[in-house]
A protein has these predicted regions:
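Asp-based, Mg2+/Mn2+-dependent phosphohydrolase catalytic module
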Residues: 1-7, 42, 102, 115-116, ...
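N-terminal helical cap/lid subdomain that shapes the substrate entry/recognition surface
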Residues: 2-96, 102-104, 115-117, 128-129
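Gly/Ser/Thr-rich helix-start
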Residues: 15, 50-55, 94, 110, ...
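Conserved SAM-binding loop
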Residues: 16, 90, 108-111, 167-168, ...
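Residue-level detector of anion-binding/catalytic polar loops
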Residues: 37, 107, 184
Length: 221
């Protein structure tokens, strides 16, 4: 389906790695520090893709317009910074997927809404990312996804035309950004979403239930 592709770009959390345990732990520590009971990790998991907003929403029912949100957010960031590599791992099949891309000589990179403060040290700490051509964070350009600017910056950095790139993500904003950047788009219907989640209205070029299925779309192996 994507035989003419020269590069693959990925979202990070929920697409390549499962960071929900560390994100949830950072928020839950804030509860226990205040004498509140711990919440089960399963409560945090569905909102892991929403970052601090999602985690504080679960932990405290707090929305971004709350007068203390910025204070709580920075505390959450400090907690997460201290634990972000403790329980985070690649989704099943991702290590093999990346190995196949490397073997085929396809360039690949990451475009995430995670700020560089976290995205850069996290990816440096994981061997999975040693062959990534670029890591673009949510604050690398003036705009985050769903704006296409981060994807276009990633394509520019690796020297591949956007039309020759595939972007893979697990959120509708990923598909919106990819389409706006004129890239092929793939919805990752695994990870945080689960196989029962309906992604049809995202209008991605394709949907995958496992990382291996991306190789099939790329006509690999």
């Amino acid at each position: 389906m994507f035989a003419s592709v020269d590069a693959v770009m990925f979202d990070l959390d929920g697409t390549l790695i499962d960071s929900a345990p560390d994100l949830g732990a950072a928020a839950d520590q804030m509860r226990t520090d205040r004498g509140l009971p711990s919440l089960p990790p399963a409560d945090y998991r569905p909102m892991a893709g929403a970052g601090a907003r999602g985690m504080l929403g679960v932990a405290f029912g707090m929305a971004p317009d709350h007068h203390d949100f910025e204070i709580f957010k920075e505390e959450f960031f400090r907690n997460y910074e201290a634990c972000m590599t403790q329980r985070t791992y690649a989704f099943k099949g991702v290590v093999d997927l990346i190995a196949q891309l490397d073997q085929a000589g396809l360039k690949w990179g990451v475009v995430t809404n995670k700020s560089e403060r976290f995205a850069l040290p996290l990816t440096r700490a994981m061997a999975l990312f040693k062959t990534a051509q670029t890591i673009v964070g949510g604050d690398t350009t003036p705009h985050a996804k769903p704006h296409p600017a981060p994807l276009l910056e990633a394509a520019r950095r690796i020297g591949v035309a956007p039309e020759k790139c595939v972007y893979v993500g697990d959120d509708e904003r990923d598909i919106i950004a990819g389409r706006a950047a004129r890239m092929f788009t793939v919805a990752a219907a695994y990870g945080y979403l689960g196989v029962t989640h309906d992604t049809a209205h995202w209008k991605a070029d394709a949907t995958i239930q496992t990382p291996y299925q991306l190789l099939q779309l790329l006509r690999m192996p």
